[in-house]
């Protein structure tokens, strides 16, 4: 490349870099802050709103069975089952589990299909709170960035939020509503086997029934 061409390329490259930096800055500045949820509970979530919009679009009644409870009123059996199943390194990572992500990428490359399993509890919470069911690369980037931000709330608060907004059936949200709907008892009273059945619903909460986990 001649000197005049190199000199002409420098301003163009600088402009491109500045544009990219500005784009990233706007991207991160416009991300929602988790700070309001440090001491306050959400009044709704993106997932709940998406489900409501879906119901209205199909002329069905909007269902929202939801009751908030503190983490201390959610069975330790359910807490442990969810962490072990959904995010075994929950208390070790900072929102993104690099080990699981690398394993998921390798598996996807092997089977030519992107599967579930790399999303941490923090990422799933970010998706439920703010992103809904959108599927795109930009959504995954936002999900990861929001998961890192959520980590500032602390692990116990993240787990409390997650267990209170997770979907556990058609219009059923949170551990308390799920426990009362499926087992007619409070979330605090769940037995180990009941906690395991609820945990098994999380990957596909609407089609699965904890009373008939095999579909029979």
Question: Could you describe each region identified by the protein language model?
Answer:
Residues 2-216:
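Juxtamembrane regions of bacterial inner-membrane/periplasmic proteins
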């Amino acid at each position: 490349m001649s000197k005049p061409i190199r000199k002409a390329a420098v301003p163009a490259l600088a402009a491109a870099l500045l544009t990219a930096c500005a784009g990233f800055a706007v991207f991160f500045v416009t991300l929602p802050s988790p700070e309001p949820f440090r001491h306050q509970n959400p009044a709704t979530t993106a997932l709940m709103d998406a489900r409501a919009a879906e119901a209205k679009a199909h002329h069905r009644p909007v269902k929202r069975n939801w009751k908030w409870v503190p983490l201390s009123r959610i069975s330790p059996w359910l807490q442990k089952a969810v962490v072990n199943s959904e995010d075994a390194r929950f208390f070790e990572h900072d929102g993104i589990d690099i080990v699981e992500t690398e394993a998921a990428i390798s598996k996807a490359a092997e089977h030519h299909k992107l599967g579930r399993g790399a999303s941490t509890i923090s990422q799933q919470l970010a998706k439920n709170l703010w992103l809904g069911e959108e599927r795109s690369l930009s959504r995954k980037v936002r999900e990861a960035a929001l998961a890192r931000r959520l980590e500032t709330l602390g692990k116990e608060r993240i787990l409390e939020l997650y267990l209170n907004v997770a979907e556990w059936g058609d219009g059923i949200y949170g551990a308390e509503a799920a426990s009362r709907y499926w087992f007619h008892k409070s979330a605090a009273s769940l037995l180990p086997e009941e906690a395991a059945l609820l945990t098994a619903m999380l990957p596909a909460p609407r089609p699965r029934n904890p009373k008939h986990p095999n579909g029979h």
